[in-house]
């Protein structure tokens, strides 16, 4: 009896395996959801869709459910979301342009000029060109046309070749193309070349601008009149009959003040509107980034509004366009 060693009671084989098997460090697999995860702050609990016994966790939405956040695909691994959609623009993303709502077509109105029917003043903002500041290379002018609500009405772009721009500078002939929110060219302004080296008072040397709306159909002209003291222009119809006059200040190079060009009737008594070149401080003195305010009556004929609008660009090229060599002196 003394030589017999007591033994423990025998246990089933299954219990022995459970005791000797080391614990699995991997957690159980998460439950499978037939849904898409959306980044961003968790929203309110979404009621369960038809066919699901219970609600889904916060931040999960079924594919059939509309959500307020777009779906994003992870790029280059898992990274935190630094920009919430709709909050701030992403890096290298241009700011969207707010356009003026497009009006309905009107009878007896050239297509594209319906915007001017609703306005009594517009702002002409020239783009700042850093290349012209750093070099002597003249670039094509670009302008943004906006209303009082800072909504874009038109975009004006110069279409002149490099040789003509840099050879003739401010005296260059040019073509300005006016486009709307759909990118359609609704107006064209052309300035022919005029030689002013022989006699500035000669009729053949006077500047002229032709306005076409739609392109190819002339609606009027802006013609310069020689005057010893001030800038004087005539706004003419398609038959070159004088309709209005534009009278500028005695000095258009006033520093620290606005330059006002008054639009008057032919007899000079009635004041119809104005073209004001705004003084923008050092930016006006050093760069070609002019700002014009154009005012006209709300009930003025839309073609005459377009002619006053066109006169603004002829004034800009003749008196406020600074070539790079002149600015460096």
From Swiss-Prot:
Region (Disordered): 1-51
Short motif PPxY motif, span: 30-33
Any Pfam family matching the protein: Scramblase
Span(s) of short sequence motif Nuclear localization signal: 271-283
Motif (SH3-binding 1): 18-25
Ranges spanned by the short sequence motif SH3-binding 3, renumbered to the chain: 98-106
Covalent lipid adducts (S-palmitoyl cysteine), residues: 197-199, 201-202
Named cofactor requirement(s): Ca(2+); Mg(2+); Zn(2+)
Compartments it resides in: Cell membrane; Nucleus
UniProt keyword Membrane, yes or no: yes
Catalytic reaction(s) noted: a 1,2-diacyl-sn-glycero-3-phosphocholine(in) = a 1,2-diacyl-sn-glycero-3-phosphocholine(out); a 1,2-diacyl-sn-glycero-3-phospho-L-serine(in) = a 1,2-diacyl-sn-glycero-3-phospho-L-serine(out)
Domains (record comment): The N-terminal proline-rich domain (PRD) is required for phospholipid scramblase activity.
Subunit structure: Interacts with PDCD6. Interacts with KPNA2; this interaction mediates the nucleus import of PLSCR4.
The protein's role, per its UniProt record: Catalyzes metal ion-induced ATP-independent rapid bidirectional and non-specific movement of phospholipids (lipid scrambling or lipid flip-flop) between the inner and outer leaflet of the plasma membrane and participates in the redistribution of phospholipids between membrane leaflets. Metal ions bind to the calcium-binding site and induce conformation change in the protein. Has a greater affi nity for Ca(2+) than Mg(2+) and Zn(2+).
Name of the protein: Phospholipid scramblase 4
Provenance organism: Homo sapiens
């Amino acid at each position: 009896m003394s030589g017999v060693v007591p033994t423990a009671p025998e246990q089933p084989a299954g219990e022995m395996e459970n005791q000797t098997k080391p614990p699995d460090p991997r957690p159980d697999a998460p439950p499978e959801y037939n849904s898409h995860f959306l980044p961003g702050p968790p929203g309110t609990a979404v009621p369960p869709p038809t066919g699901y016994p219970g609600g889904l966790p916060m931040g999960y939405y079924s594919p059939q459910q509309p959500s307020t956040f777009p779906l994003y695909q992870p790029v280059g691994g898992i990274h935190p979301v630094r920009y919430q959609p709709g909050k701030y623009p992403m890096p290298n993303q241009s700011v969207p342009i707010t356009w003026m709502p497009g009006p309905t077509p009107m009878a007896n109105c050239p297509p594209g000029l319906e915007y001017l029917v609703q306005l009594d003043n517009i702002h002409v903002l020239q783009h700042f060109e850093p290349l012209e500041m750093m070099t002597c290379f003249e670039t094509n002018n670009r302008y943004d046309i906006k209303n009082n609500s800072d909504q874009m009405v038109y975009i004006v772009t110069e279409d002149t070749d490099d040789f003509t721009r840099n050879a003739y500078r401010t005296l260059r002939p040019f073509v300005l193309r006016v486009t709307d929110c759909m990118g359609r060219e609704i107006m064209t302004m052309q300035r022919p070349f005029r030689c002013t080296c022989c006699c500035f008072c000669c009729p053949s040397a006077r500047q002229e601008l032709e306005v076409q709306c739609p392109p190819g159909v002339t609606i009027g002209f802006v013609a310069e009149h020689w005057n010893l003291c001030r800038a004087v222009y005539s706004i003419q119809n398609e038959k070159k009959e004088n309709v209005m006059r534009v009278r500028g200040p005695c000095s258009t190079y006033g520093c620290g003040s606005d330059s006002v060009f008054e639009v008057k009737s032919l007899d000079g008594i009635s004041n119809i509107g104005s073209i004001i070149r705004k003084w923008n401080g050092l930016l006006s003195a050093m760069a070609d980034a002019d700002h014009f305010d154009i005012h006209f009556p709300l009930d003025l004929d839309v073609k005459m509004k377009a002619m006053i609008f066109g006169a603004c660009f002829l004034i800009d090229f003749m008196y406020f366009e600074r070539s790079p060599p002149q600015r460096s002196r």
